[in-house]
């Protein structure tokens, strides 16, 4: 990865310029296409103006670290005539960067190599309600508020409270029920009897869907 990134950076150092259109492939295999606004050779930071995903009236500004990109391609050279870029709101950029880093850190907290991807998704569903600082892995168990524990296989019957807090337990059980009820049914294996089918389950309405606050202890 490092060698590929280095070769990609070296390839564009002498050929792309401000106003050119570039496509960068990140280390997460995501492609970002945009117009070059600036490039710092020392830090290998490339600033791109990209089409906004939410509105055509605005543009998204991406700061790409080329040292972490697996590929960089110039798809359109600048014709030499381009408008000066607008001044960036540095405070807004710093705030967005901080939020992006926080989201990535929160996602990493949910990772556990010893449990299934489904268990990690359940962890994130619970953390969205309580906050990532209130949820943690204790071995194979999910611990919430340092008092409620969910053990494998992470169903309603596996919820235990060390302080007999029924309010928290019931709320967490509703999260678990909604999580599994809204997951797609497994695809039946080929050759299975046509008469065997799992009943469809519709999501249950609860305080989670309405965004009601977490009950206090």
UniProtKB/Swiss-Prot annotation:
Segments forming domain AD:
86-184
Family classification: Belongs to the LSM12 family.
What is one term from the GO cellular component aspect held by the record? Answer: nucleus
The protein's assembly and partners: Component of the Atx2-tyf activator complex, composed of Atx2, tyf, pAbp, Lsm12a. Interacts with tyf, Atx2 and pAbp.
**Annotated region (Disordered), positions in chain:** 185-217
The name of this protein is: LSM12 homolog A
- Indicate the segments forming the Sm domain, all copies: 9-78
Q: What does this protein do?
A: Component of the Atx2-tyf activator complex which functions in the circadian pacemaker neurons to activate the TYF-dependent translation of per and maintain 24 hour periodicity in circadian behaviors. Within the Atx2-tyf complex, likely to function as a molecular adapter which stabilizes the interaction between Atx2 and the translational regulator tyf.
Q: Which gene holds the coding sequence for this protein?
A: Lsm12a
Annotated TM spans:
none
Which cysteine residues pair off into disulfide bonds?
none
Q: Where is the composition biased (Low complexity)?
A: 190-217
In a knockout, what does one observe?
A: RNAi-mediated knockdown in pigment dispersing factor (Pdf)-expressing clock neurons disrupts circadian locomotor rhythms, with mutants displaying long period locomotor rhythms under constant dark conditions. Enhances the period-lengthening phenotype of tyf mutants.
* Biological process terms in GO annotation: RNA metabolic process
The record's PROSITE patterns line, in alphabetical order, gives: AD (PS52001), SM (PS52002)
Pfam hit, one: AD
Drop me one GO molecular function for this one: RNA binding
């Amino acid at each position: 990865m490092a060698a590929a990134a280095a070769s990609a950076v070296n390839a564009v150092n002498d050929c792309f310029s401000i106003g050119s259109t570039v496509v960068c492939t990140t280390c997460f295999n995501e492609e970002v296409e945009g117009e070059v606004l600036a490039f710092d050779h020392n830090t290998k930071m490339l600033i791109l103006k990209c089409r906004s995903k939410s509105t055509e009236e605005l543009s998204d500004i991406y700061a790409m670290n080329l040292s972490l990109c697996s590929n960089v391609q110039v798809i359109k050279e600048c014709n030499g005539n381009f408008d000066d870029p607008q001044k960036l709101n540095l405070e807004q950029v710093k705030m967005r960067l901080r939020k992006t880093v926080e989201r990535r850190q929160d996602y990493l907290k949910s990772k556990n190599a010893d449990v299934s991807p489904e268990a990690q998704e359940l962890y994130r569903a619970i953390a969205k309600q309580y906050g990532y600082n209130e949820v943690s892995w204790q071995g194979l168990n999910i611990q919430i508020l340092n008092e409620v524990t969910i053990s494998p296989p992470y169903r309603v019957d596996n919820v235990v409270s060390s302080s007999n807090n029924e309010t928290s337990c019931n709320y967490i059980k509703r999260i678990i029920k909604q999580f599994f009820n809204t997951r797609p049914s497994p695809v039946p294996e080929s050759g299975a009897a046509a008469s065997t089918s799992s009943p469809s389950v519709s999501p249950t309405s609860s305080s989670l869907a309405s965004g009601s606050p977490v009950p206090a202890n």
